[in-house]
């Protein structure tokens, strides 16, 4: 089975919706998507929030159209599963670096970036949950 994970829709809106649908169609058999439950993006402009929401909506509809089961998970839940909690009130960059470090520990042979660490951790969370 295939696990798909997305912690943000930021990459989705950079593509055409048809491209996303074509991509998801490849993985529609025996797949499940773990998708981070998101609210607004604090500190972002209205237009940036709109674009983010549009991409998130396209992703959600693509998953529905392809019949890929989707599990939404809050950041607190998947982060807690790895013993990660931002109790020190780290800056956004410091927190992203913490997530990246954890993803690098779990995936030593992958090229982990600040942009991909959330998705890798959510995917790993999903893999663990699917085994239960």
Residue ranges and their predicted role:
Residues 99-102, 106-132:
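Acidic, Mg2+-coordinating catalytic module of metal-dependent nucleases/exonucleases
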């Amino acid at each position: 089975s295939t696990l798909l994970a997305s912690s943000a829709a930021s990459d989705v809106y950079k593509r055409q919706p048809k491209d996303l649908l074509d991509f998801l169609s490849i993985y529609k058999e025996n797949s499940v998507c773990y998708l981070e439950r998101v609210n607004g993006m604090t500190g972002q402009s209205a237009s940036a929030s709109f674009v983010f929401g549009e991409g998130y909506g396209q992703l959600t509809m693509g998953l529905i159209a392809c019949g890929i089961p989707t599990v939404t998970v809050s950041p607190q839940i998947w982060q807690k599963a790895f013993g990660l909690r931002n109790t020190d009130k780290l800056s956004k960059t410091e927190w992203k670096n913490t997530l990246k470090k954890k993803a690098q520990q779990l995936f030593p042979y992958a090229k982990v970036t600040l942009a991909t660490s959330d998705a890798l951790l959510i995917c790993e969370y999903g893999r663990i949950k699917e085994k239960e």
